[in-house]
């Protein structure tokens, strides 16, 4: 290896992912590794569920402190002196895009950065399934019969009230394999493998914010 640092120094730092469940964390990991290939082998996860978006004040500070402590703990388990290069905390807003999304994202991310310095709050609107609806061909690649109805294509998926219901009842339908939350990592793997992430069919502000955060993190935290 050359003297110049490239990507993440795995022996000294890791990226930590926290999220609502394993499916969300694995999905985030797939997307992060695509955008920052140097992270492969350098991502670790916190298994505890995240509950931040409704918290404020001292309650928010306490919950973020718990996550930060766990992040530093899992980093230390990778080897003495290992630091957290960056922390990604995912949560679904369970509400559509709007002022509440912006205010919540800002409030929580500011607290994460106040306590750790290098972190991103990945708040999906209304939930991560809304991101999947940006990639109809990826959904069909997972299950050929899965089709996104025309009325949902090319739209702002952050405005859909219940993306999960759309996937379960209208995309996957009632015949054959029906979408479940455990399909999420496979769907995002298909998004990456097919190169669909480069040209989403529609928009979602939380998706755009996530990719902007990954690019920013790559420049500021992961490269020496």
Name each model-derived stretch.
Residues 2-14, 23-54, 58, 65-224:
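C-terminal accessory helical subdomains adjacent to catalytic cores in phosphodiester-
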């Amino acid at each position: 290896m050359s003297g110049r640092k490239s990507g993440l120094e795995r022996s000294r730092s890791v990226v930590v992912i926290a999220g609502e469940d394993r499916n969300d964390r694995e999905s985030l990991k797939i997307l992060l590794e695509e955008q920052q290939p140097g992270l492969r082998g350098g991502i670790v996860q916190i298994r505890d569920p995240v509950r931040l978006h409704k918290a404020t004040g001292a309650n928010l500070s306490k919950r973020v402190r718990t996550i930060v402590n766990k992040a530093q703990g899992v980093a230390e388990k990778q080897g003495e002196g290992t630091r957290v290069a960056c922390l990604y905390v995912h949560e679904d807003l369970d509400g559509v895009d709007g002022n509440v999304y912006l205010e919540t994202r800002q409030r929580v991310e500011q607290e994460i950065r106040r306590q750790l310095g290098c972190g991103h709050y990945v708040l999906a609107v209304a939930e991560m399934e809304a991101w999947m609806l940006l990639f109809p061909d990826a959904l069909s690649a997972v299950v050929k019969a899965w089709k996104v109805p025309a009325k949902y294509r090319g739209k702002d998926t952050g405005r859909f009230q219940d993306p999960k219901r759309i996937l379960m009842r209208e995309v996957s339908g009632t015949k054959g394999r029906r979408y479940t939350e455990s399909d999420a990592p496979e769907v995002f793997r298909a998004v990456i493998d097919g190169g669909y992430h480069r040209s989403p069919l529609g928009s979602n502000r939380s998706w755009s914010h996530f990719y902007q955060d990954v690019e920013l993190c790559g420049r500021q935290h992961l490269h020496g």
